[in-house]
């Protein structure tokens, strides 16, 4: 359905619904909204081909070639577009904090606690 058709149908529906007053037996039901995970959930890749996965508060990074776990940790949502990752590098045996900004649905710009910057691109 194209935009013009959708807009016309929506306008018609609003016009018709404004003509009908709800009676005492009619009840307005508010359907529960489906809970979705954070916007950052999913698989992301950096410019070196390293895959990072965000899933329900858990974070992991794996190599592309051997699927070796390189880092793992947790993340929290600071705002709808800001995320804080606390992770342990299994390669360096260090802990670090990374702040990431979701600048578009397909790009995360991140800064480590050592002020290194990198970007991740959503996969698939």
From Swiss-Prot:
* Chain residues carrying a lipid of type S-diacylglycerol cysteine: 19
Q: How does it sit in the membrane?
A: Lipid-anchor
Lipidated residues (N-palmitoyl cysteine): 19
Q: Which residues cross the membrane?
A: none
Q: Which residues form the signal peptide?
A: 1-18
Location in the cell reads: Cell outer membrane
Look up the record and report any one GO term of the cellular component aspect: cell outer membrane
Give the record's keywords alphabetically. Cell outer membrane, Lipoprotein, Membrane, Palmitate, Signal
Homology family: Belongs to the rhizobiaceae omp10 lipoprotein family.
**The protein's name in its UniProt record:** Outer membrane lipoprotein omp10 homolog
- The source organism is Agrobacterium fabrum (strain C58 / ATCC 33970)
What gene codes for this chain?
omp10
């Amino acid at each position: 359905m194209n935009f013009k058709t959708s807009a016309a149908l929506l306008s018609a529906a609003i016009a018709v619904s404004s003509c009908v007053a709800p009676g005492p037996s009619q009840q307005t039901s508010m359907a529960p909204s489906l809970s979705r995970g954070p916007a950052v959930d999913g698989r992301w890749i950096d410019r070196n081909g390293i895959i990072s996965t965000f899933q329900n508060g858990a974070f992991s990074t794996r190599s592309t070639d051997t699927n070796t776990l390189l880092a793992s940790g947790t993340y929290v949502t600071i705002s709808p577009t800001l995320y804080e990752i606390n992770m342990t590098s299994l390669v360096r045996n260090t802990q670090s904090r990374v702040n990431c900004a979701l600048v578009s649905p397909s790009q995360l710009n991140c800064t480590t606690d050592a002020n290194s910057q990198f970007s991740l691109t959503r996969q698939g």
